[in-house]
Amino acid sequence: MRSKFKDEHPFEKRKAEAERIRQKYSDRIPVICEKVEKSDIATIDKKKYLVPADLTVGQFVYVIRKRIKLSPEKAIFIFVDEVLPPTAALMSSIYEEHKDEDGFLYITYSGENTFGDFETA
């Protein structure tokens, strides 16, 4: 999936920003979170997050749910490289495995399981 953030910001600028963030906040992970294009779920109000390294994927999903004001009965799926990461995984390990060459971790979310693959631990 194409990232709007990548389209709007040149690579060198993104890389420099991610490096600056990692130097200043070594215990945080720079995350870009965007909605899957054709999903009918609400669009998030901000794309950029500084996530504590010890946060789990499940806790990050909770943050996203709150930001888009998603009711408890509605489903949300988050994807890293078009795969559902394990809920108990630490964001730091997801970052190390899937960070982009610009230094950001790109996460997409949807109201439906659009890709269908689960990552096995």
UniProtKB/Swiss-Prot annotation:
GO terms for biological process: autophagosome assembly; autophagosome maturation; cellular response to nitrogen starvation; mitophagy; protein transport. It is a lipid-anchor. Residues 117-121 form a propeptide. GO terms for molecular function: phosphatidylethanolamine binding. Pfam families: ATG8 (PF02991). Coiled coil: none annotated. The C-terminal 5 residues are removed to expose Gly-116 at the C-terminus. The C-terminal Gly is then amidated with phosphatidylethanolamine by an activating system similar to that for ubiquitin. GO terms for cellular component: autophagosome membrane; cytoplasmic vesicle; fungal-type vacuole membrane. InterPro entries: Atg8-like, Ubiquitin-like_domsf. It is found in: Cytoplasmic vesicle, Autophagosome membrane; Vacuole membrane. It comes from the Eukaryota. Keywords: Autophagy, Cytoplasmic vesicle, Lipoprotein, Membrane, Protein transport, Transport, Ubl conjugation pathway, Vacuole. A lipid is attached at G116 (Phosphatidylethanolamine amidated glycine). Belongs to the ATG8 family. Ubiquitin-like modifier involved in autophagosome formation. With cpr-1/atg4, mediates the delivery of the autophagosomes to the vacuole via the microtubule cytoskeleton. Required for selective autophagic degradation of the nucleus (nucleophagy) as well as for mitophagy which contributes to regulate mitochondrial quantity and quality by eliminating the mitochondria to a basal level to fulfill cellular energy requirements and preventing excess ROS production. Also participates in membrane fusion events that take place in the early secretory pathway. This is Autophagy-related protein 8. It comes from Neurospora crassa (strain ATCC 24698 / 74-OR23-1A / CBS 708.71 / DSM 1257 / FGSC 987). The lineage of its organism: Eukaryota, Fungi, Dikarya, Ascomycota, Pezizomycotina. The gene is apg-6.
